[in-house]
Amino acid sequence: MKIQQLIVFLFAVVLIDARTPKRYSELDIVMSTCTTFIGKYGTVCTSTGKRSTNWNCYCKTDAGFGTISDCLVRGFNNNTNIISKFTESCNMTESKFHAKYDKIQAEFKTNGTEYAKMTTKSSSGSKTSASASKSSKSTGSSNASKSSTNAHGSNSSTSSTSSSSSKSGKGNSGTSTTETITTPLLIDYKKFTPYKDAYQMSNNNFNLSINYGSGLLGYWAGILAIAIFANMIKKMFPSLTNYLSGSISNLFRKHLFLPATFRKKKAQEFSIGVYGFFDGLIPTRLETIIVVIFVVLTGLFSALHIHHVKDNPQYATKNAELGHLIADRTGILGTFLIPLLILFGGRNNFLQWLTGWDFATFIMYHRWISRVDVLLIIVHAITFSVSDKATGKYNTRMKRDFMIWGTVSTICGGFILFQAMLFFRRKCYEVFFLIHIVLVVFFVVGGYYHLESQGYGDFMWAAIAVWAFDRVVRLGRIFFFGARKATVSIKGDDTLKIEVPKPKYWKSVAGGHAFIHFLKPTLFLQSHPFTFTTTESNDKIVLYAKIKNGITSNIAKYLSPLPGNTATIRVLVEGPYGEPSSAGRNCKNVVFVAGGNGIPGIYSECVDLAKKSKNQSIKLIWIIRHWKSLSWFTEELEYLKKTNVQSTIYVTQPQDCSGLECFEHDVSFEKKSDEKDSVESSQYSLISNIKQGLSHVEFIEGRPDISTQVEQEVKQADGAIGFVTCGHPAMVDELRFAVTQNLNVSKHRVEYHEQLQTWA
């Protein structure tokens, strides 16, 4: 499946790069400034379209060239770089430009207004145009100036055509003529500076927005590149990491790479407020730093190089000006992030294989990028509304289709931000998931129709492509696996056991997981991830699921009244996903620690390593509450006899012997006594028989001291040691903390690998 994943990734990259957004060159900004300023006084060259320049007119006609060249020379202080770029666009030499310009200036000085229209502005703000009688003079006149082309910058700065041209308001304060002027229009450029500053700010803001958007993608590309490099090194040279066990390495690992952000809680949610409404998950310290830097960069990039231009002719108020600039910036930044957040949220993400990150890590980053992106879009919508209100364009603009779709996308994004809170995901994941998909569809479609006319539609196509390919690959996995008849039963009162015949080509991944669709009328649209093991004959996968709310509860209710609490249900399987931890490759000693229903994935990885290993020390520790929990994992525990795995099971509530009747039908644990014992003695007898049947397993009653256990294991290790865990979040966090506190106990490297997939 890695080929399909690579196609998804590369196709997205190609789409993003297919048509980059419009960037404004220095000449674009100059021409935009000049043509707008000239347009206040008259029409010299007609427009050929939005944000386009009538090059034919400005390069080849006397009126167009004479007017625009005067703006370049006097308005932009004869900037040689600008003039050079203009001449390239007009396919002329710089010497020809200067000669032609000097000729026009000489004609004007010699013949006054017979050659050019001279614009002035009265004190009342109305514009007057002094025009000479139609003369036969032309640019080819023999009276053209023969002066040096390098002198006209200073010569024309005090041209007699200059007028007082004071600006009495924002925008087009004069009333421009509608007819096209056929002779050069020479204008006073004393009040030109606000135009230069304003158009430099507004047009360059688009360029900076694209640069900063690329910078945000570059930031994540850098993070991914580091992760890919580290992962490739670990895979190609697995023993190399064992040398990274010195004080400096351990210092970074103890305080940066391994620990939770705040003391212990990483897998456990933190609580704010009442009823768990503001509960959330905090990633590791390193992941938090990565996210914080991203958030800070986004905030900086949203505001850098945005400021108020005094006497800005484009906007009537400061609020309108700054609102428009911030809206453009945040909108473009948000657009750049959309394909990335879709990619990070997909199950068939090729980057998982390259980086070695698990799905939970990508989902965590997906959520944070999504939060930042939606906030950018909300700021974009608010600031544009403020700007449009200030300029009086709001009501008209909101009737346009692209604005309606933009509003739809923004509203859906806001609902996604609210609806994706941990509170809703945990309370009813199925409802959350269905609503989430619907909202995302409208968010992306609305975003496309909003952005397509602005030149940014390709970003949405990239997002759609990533999403669509992910769905196609997922459907392909399901199709080739087929609809299989699974045997589903309730074990130990709180666990579902799902046995699914698998195709021969389907390779089980140690420590992996698969998504299951139950083909029941109200359940088939839902899919849930479960870790699995395989039978000894390798013809089935066996999945275990703790009965909670939602789909597992519905299945349990369906099975409860049936004989043996068992039924055959057709299922669709999507997978496998995940991979074993690197502890088996890197460490001479591996300790697998599972809690409750976290055992299947840990067990499969442990047994897989035992089959391949010859001289590694492998230990399996399983922490359960009650004896009855053993009932649904009996076959797997018995198989451990054939391996070199040292197994220990902690029973934290051994006095609770309820549910042991499920062992009575197991031949391995039949009572050895013929006495008619009391219920209590029968239970203890059965427990004794369980221990005898699993004599290769050490049973310890009580809760383990994880910190002490880790310290002992590290001290006893004769080489690098790795801890691999999955189970209750509190236990997992406790083990993580214990490992970070014992990195320096031994001279050997100590590793920690977490297989708990927390994404709901």
Swiss-Prot record:
A Gene Ontology term for the protein's cellular component: plasma membrane
Mode of membrane association: Multi-pass membrane protein
Binding site for heme 1: 366, 436
Reaction catalysed by this enzyme: 2 a Fe(II)-siderophore + NADP(+) + H(+) = 2 a Fe(III)-siderophore + NADPH
Region described as Disordered: 119-177
Glycosylation sites (chain numbering): 78, 91, 111, 143, 155, 207, 615, 744
Recorded GO MF terms: ferric-chelate reductase (NADPH) activity; ferric-chelate reductase activity; metal ion binding
Domain Ferric oxidoreductase, residue spans: 330-445
Annotated positions binding NADP(+): 575-578, 726-727
Cell compartment(s), UniProt: Cell membrane
Record EC number: 1.16.1.9
Transmembrane segments: 213-233, 289-309, 325-345, 372-392, 404-424, 431-451
Pfam families: FAD_binding_8, Ferric_reduct, NAD_binding_6
Induction: Transcription is negatively regulated by SFU1, copper, amphotericin B, and caspofungin; and induced by ciclopirox olamine.
Cytoplasmic side: 234-288, 346-371, 425-430
PANTHER family, per database record: FERRIC REDUCTASE TRANSMEMBRANE COMPONENT 3-RELATED (PTHR32361:SF9), FERRIC/CUPRIC REDUCTASE TRANSMEMBRANE COMPONENT (PTHR32361)
Free-text function comment from the UniProt entry: Ferric reductase responsible for reducing extracellular iron and copper prior to import. Catalyzes the reductive uptake of Fe(3+)-salts and Fe(3+) bound to catecholate or hydroxamate siderophores. Fe(3+) is reduced to Fe(2+), which then dissociates from the siderophore and can be imported by the high-affinity Fe(2+) transport complex in the plasma membrane. Also participates in Cu(2+) reduction and Cu(+) uptake. Involved in maintenance of cell wall integrity (CWI), mitochondrial function, and interaction between the pathogen and the host.
Protein name: Ferric/cupric reductase transmembrane component 1
Organism: Candida albicans (strain SC5314 / ATCC MYA-2876)
Source taxonomy: Eukaryota, Fungi, Dikarya, Ascomycota, Saccharomycotina
Gene (name only): CFL1
